[in-house]
Amino acid sequence: MTKSWHQYSKRAPVPQRTGPDGFVYDSATEMRRGMDLQLLQRGGVISDLQRQVKFPLEFKCSCGAIQVMAGKRIAHYTADFVYTEKGRRVIEDCKGYADEPSKLRIRVFEALYGEKVVIMKKIRGTGWVRE
């Protein structure tokens, strides 16, 4: 029996990475950081922990008679974690490797919202390092 070409070109299902809490994480690094942040929340160091928070990247400006993409959503930035630490909101992203599109989205987010994104990296043996 011969199979047609489309039966061979089907992609294999990608396994979902789930943590011990049942939440689907994008990477093992993000899952480890999420577990660490949950421990910090239980200990009272941080509060209001949220995961995968989407921020629309839309420009709302008009210059005289010219409107530049007024109210049009161009893209969105998804922060890995958002939490409150010492009364301040912290927006955090876990990166093993930061590619150019993600760097650009972070820069656009920081310019539009006026908030700094904390990028965390996992270093073997030493824990988490802020970039």
Feature-to-residue mapping (PLM):
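Electrostatic, structured charged patches in enzyme active sites and in nucleic-acid/phosphate-binding
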Residues: 1-131
